[in-house]
Regions:
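Enrichment for repetitive, rod-forming helical segments
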Residues: 26-27, 75, 79
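Short acidic DE-rich linear segments
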Residues: 2, 77-83
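Short, charge-rich amphipathic interface segments used for partner binding and complex assembly
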Residues: 37-76
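Short recognition patches in nucleic-acid-associated and regulatory proteins
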Residues: 25-43
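Short, charge/polar-rich alpha-helical segments
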Residues: 1-28
Length: 83
């Protein structure tokens, strides 16, 4: 399982990084000087907060990050003998 988990974790990290770039690109179409930090706080920018495409892409990123956290937790539990 560690090799499988490692491969999955690597793939998921690549997906997260790609989606972060995509979210930032969409954000910069609305707010040209948006930073990676800004996209973590879209409520500070009405243009981002109300844009459906931004929210869609941000939701996908949130899902990937949630899955990444769950996978890490599962791997940690398995390595500590917790089921």
């Amino acid at each position: 399982m560690p090799n499988d988990a490692s491969s999955i974790a690597q793939l998921l990290q690549e997906m997260v990084e790609h989606q972060q770039s995509k979210v930032l690109k969409v954000a910069r179409e609305l707010v040209p000087d948006a930073t990676p930090e800004d996209i973590r706080n879209p409520q500070d920018f009405p243009e981002l907060f109300t844009d459906t495409l931004f929210n869609y892409e941000d939701g996908i990123l949130t899902g990937y990050l949630t899955l990444q956290t769950a996978l890490r937790n599962q791997v940690n539990n398995e390595s500590n003998g917790i089921e």
